[in-house]
Amino acid sequence: MASVAQESAGSQRRLPPRHGALRGLLLLCLWLPSGRAALPPAAPLSELHAQLSGVEQLLEEFRRQLQQERPQEELELELRAGGGPQEDCPGPGSGGYSAMPDAIIRTKDSLAAGASFLRAPAAVRGWRQCVAACCSEPRCSVAVVELPRRPAPPAAVLGCYLFNCTARGRNVCKFALHSGYSSYSLSRAPDGAALATARASPRQEKDAPPLSKAGQDVVLHLPTDGVVLDGRESTDDHAIVQYEWALLQGDPSVDMKVPQSGTLKLSHLQEGTYTFQLTVTDTAGQRSSDNVSVTVLRAAYSTGGCLHTCSRYHFFCDDGCCIDITLACDGVQQCPDGSDEDFCQNLGLDRKMVTHTAASPALPRTTGPSEDAGGDSLVEKSQKATAPNKPPALSNTEKRNHSAFWGPESQIIPVMPDSSSSGKNRKEESYIFESKGDGGGGEHPAPETGAVLPLALGLAITALLLLMVACRLRLVKQKLKKARPITSEESDYLINGMYL
């Protein structure tokens, strides 16, 4: 009871001055009606004590309401700072504690922040016994006492819960107001036993620096949409709390975005070499860095190499290389000699007229086997059928590009060459391409096996019909033969046979 009285008095001492004024006003309001009642002088003192006890109950209820209206952040700051009167730990243990009535720990949030539950001592008869158990526990920093319901039995057992709220050198526990619970925060002073324990177990207190991994170097070819660098493979013995990316070398106009923690998305890359540095920071503030390079080449064949396997879906350069057909006529020279863009400079979209230059007398460089024999034969057949007296045929490279661009069913109509063209080591010829189908289907050749299957089915059905007709005619012929009337010669033969 003495301790409860001390706590009540301490809580009343902590009330602001305005609360004292409100208390006086409330006492005055309660005292005036009693004076107006004109009690006799010989009124028993028991009635006065009853009125005073009622006033005290009202004040206590008013104090609790004011305490419940306090912000939760103020309560947490007071508990973390060890607010309230400091008292020495009862029993063994050093340090002091501060009490906060009607406060309970938010277990789930505190454990998620790094706190840990130690134990729940049994057979606790008072809050001092719970605080003493926390003081005797080296890692205990908060003790939560669950008070019994009123009226409490004489030997009621209290609930006692011990927590370690210290993580990464600070208090991480969170609290909330709740009647029926009291929390006690311990503040320990370093003693010789703690220092000896720390020296005896240096491995537990050691925090190694993090290991930064920015990933492997990247090589890209223009045009490109960008790349994503991933540094989430960085490791630490505790945890990594921050990732920082920095551009050390390269065009500063590159667009750098962080879609997720530890990653970096790059866009608007230009030709050249970029160097990026990843710096990671762990929970102890230790840092580690690693570099990664991003090399952006001019084009897919800017290194001088050529595609080794060429097909009708590729554009054949004048020097013998081949590139993807979609890279031609895109405004960027992909061929080493730039013939992919020279081929399309005189391309008229309204007349579809292309001016080609015949190959030079020098033999082109061979880089790989060609798979476009079918495309060449189709172009040659169409040229022979439509222009028997046309000028000299195009080179193999030009014919392949024509076949890839305009399709195997295109017709080539010769046009008279320009008289102003020069004939020095080369001949210029003009052709107008008129595709039978729409322009969208010129990139893929017509399948040759598509007409074989319908033809085979037609022949099979025709043969079956002919067989059925032949069988039908044979049956009709046999029926007609059986139903033929007897001739005169046959009747005479039968009659003579009867008399013989």
UniProtKB/Swiss-Prot annotation:
Any single Gene Ontology cellular-component annotation: plasma membrane
CDD domains: LDLa (cd00112), PKD (cd00146)
All residue ranges annotated as the PKD domain in the record: 210-305
Domain MANSC: 99-184
Modified residues (Phosphoserine): 491
Assigned keywords, A-Z: Disulfide bond, Glycoprotein, Membrane, Phosphoprotein, Receptor, Signal, Transmembrane, Transmembrane helix
Positions on the Cytoplasmic side per record topology: 474-500
Gene Ontology terms for molecular function: phosphoprotein binding
BP-aspect Gene Ontology terms: multicellular organismal response to stress; response to cold; response to heat; response to immobilization stress; response to mechanical stimulus; response to starvation; response to water deprivation
InterPro entries cross-referenced by the UniProt entry: Ig-like_fold, LDL_receptor-like_sf, LDLR_class-A_CS, LDrepeatLR_classA_rpt, MANSC_dom, MANSC_N, PKD/Chitinase_dom, PKD_dom
Topological domain spans for side Extracellular: 38-450
Pfam families to which the protein is assigned, alphabetical: K319L-like_PKD, Ldl_recept_a, MANEC
Cellular compartments annotated: Membrane
Signal peptide boundaries: 1-37
Disulfide bonds: 310-322, 317-335, 329-344
Region span, Disordered: 358-445
The protein's name in its UniProt record: Low-density lipoprotein receptor-related protein 11
Organism: Homo sapiens
